């Protein structure tokens, strides 16, 4: 087995630099985690506790920093990700300025196609909750599918829990 110390100094430095470039290139082109469907998919279907810090940390580790912070949410590009057989291009997680805690995703399919994919994979059915030209679809656990230009957006939003109210101080009479 050949060691770096047995190579000429210049060759050792070049080999070290080349291996560093391979490692940094691999870090940039991260694969979608195998847990993506379980973690993000169940979160979008409101089948799990909705905690924005948990989803933010998960997406940060899996896809790197959010590419934008807009509309009370951090937006992450999720190249190569699929949920229910449908490509998902972005996932958004609420920040602490929103009155809701939410996780959402932009799917590369119409709401009708996304709904059919979820029914086929999970068996969860959605009901149209309005009669507009672009109806909102809602499932029992509160997951919603809405139009997002030519694509669809699916999200789970819950009210942010308020801190417990402290009872007023009890006045005591001094003796």
How does the language model describe each region?
Residues 31-91:
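N-terminal secretory signal peptides
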């Amino acid at each position: 087995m050949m060691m770096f110390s047995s190579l000429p100094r210049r060759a050792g430095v070049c080999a070290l630099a080349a291996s560093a470039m391979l490692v940094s290139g691999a870090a940039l082109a991260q694969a979608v985690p195998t847990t993506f469907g379980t973690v993000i998919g169940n979160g979008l279907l409101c089948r799990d506790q909705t905690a924005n810090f948990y989803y933010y940390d998960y997406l940060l580790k899996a896809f790197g920093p959010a590419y934008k912070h807009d509309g009370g949410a951090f937006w992450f590009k999720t190249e190569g990700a699929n949920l229910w057989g449908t490509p998902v291009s972005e996932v958004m997680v609420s920040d602490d300025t929103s009155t809701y805690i939410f996780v959402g995703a932009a799917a590369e399919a119409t709401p009708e196609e996304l709904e059919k994919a979820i029914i086929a994979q999970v068996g969860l059915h959605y009901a149209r909750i309005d009669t507009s030209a672009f109806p909102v679809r809602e499932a029992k656990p509160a997951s919603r599918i809405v139009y997002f230009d030519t694509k669809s957006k699916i999200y789970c939003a819950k009210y942010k829990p308020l801190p417990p109210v402290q009872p007023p101080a009890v006045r005591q009479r001094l003796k």
